[in-house]
């Protein structure tokens, strides 16, 4: 195993793999994964990858849709990078053998999803992320300068003279290891598992955000958590994602009375932005006292089952026929727009540390991510981070250039002594779902923050006496850390914008809150 590689990549999703491929020709690369290498959010991405390749499309149109969905908070320079550099990187995937669906004349098939003005979403059935990951892993496996350590428990970043110089981790046999490198990339994915209801796999616990925060890096915009409107809503079953592409192909949301309802909430109906659809579903459930369903019975049954084989199979396991039965759906935590603050090259506020993909906050998504932009973000910014990793580390901290909400109430004003009993993972997830979920209030969030602050302190104390390789203790600590950061940010933003909705501040406030919230270890 390389313990003195040139570059370290933590994570094995699209951002980490694309970075490793770019770094391999110039040095030795160590990829650290917390589970099996193919277990990442990338592999669970169904809908597709959005990119302006059609004759009726352009980077300008893609940028406009992205910015509109972001509800006034997108970093427009980052958006330009995404939409302009996306096409060549996606073409590279095609050249490498990615089997995107094609139409009858052999052209790439383009789907439409919510808030897109044209069809621009390339897909591989309903398992696009898995197909992209297959191609990237095939290329990585051919690179002799890239080594992968599976089931590695990363417990901290090595910091010397205010610069990240490597990582501390435990290998799959439980032996402690320190690996030092010129640059370290966080590509650890999302944090959906902080919430009780989520479409994310078990690995998505926000480890990268916690690692960066404890090393001294800034985090940004963590109040913006996207709740996907249509997860399978069967009691006792996992919240399996029911792709937005189903609605893009004509699927309709109906209430328990069989009535379509989305046009009552938004002029774009079933293809309104995700945050709008998610809240509308909950309101419809409350109003009718029943469930909400996705109906595809008016579409061709053969087309539905062939276009969405993975979803059809999961529904079949639940005793449901995707093409004929109303499918019960409801919102679930899906994606975190915020993360470790970075510039457009993945550089964080800590020299030697970079971040790309969902763990990072480039500002490209603003307050609400446009559907199917996540795979594109990982691809583009993973490759760009690899370029920055080859440069000499900056002498000073990175500056993103984004406007900050420095007037926000300091979080110390919200702290209460409380009891130092550590919350269990299940208690954290229940608390976040109930108090920092789709609908937020000051009272609920103040209570959540107080409990999470106390639990954070208790977990820190517990770690001091726990075995250093106690994986459960570290996972609990990371989970509480990220939950605490999300709750703190949500409490401080006194408005509603994008995925952040407060019953006590229901309107968007551009005068006071058209800015980004930053947190770090000193606050």
Describe the predicted segments one by one.
Residues 1-5, 22, 28, 36-38, ...:
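Glycine- and aromatic-enriched mobile tails/lids
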Residues 35-67, 71, 237-240:
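Conserved N-terminal glycine-rich FAD pyrophosphate-binding loop of Rossmann-like flavoproteins
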Residues 183-240, 373-384:
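Glycine-rich loop(s) and the adjacent beta-strand/alpha-helix scaffold that form part
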Residues 37, 211, 217-327, 388-392, ...:
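An anion/pyrophosphate-binding glycine-rich loop and adjacent beta-alpha core
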Residues 156-178, 320-364, 370:
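FAD-site-proximal beta/loop scaffold in flavoenzymes
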Residues 74-87, 120-138, 149, 198-206, ...:
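Short beta-strand to alpha-helix junction loop
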Residues 7-31:
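N-terminal Rossmann-like FAD-binding beta1-loop-alpha1 element of flavoenzymes
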Residues 95-175, 180, 187, 196, ...:
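Conserved redox-cofactor binding core of oxidoreductases
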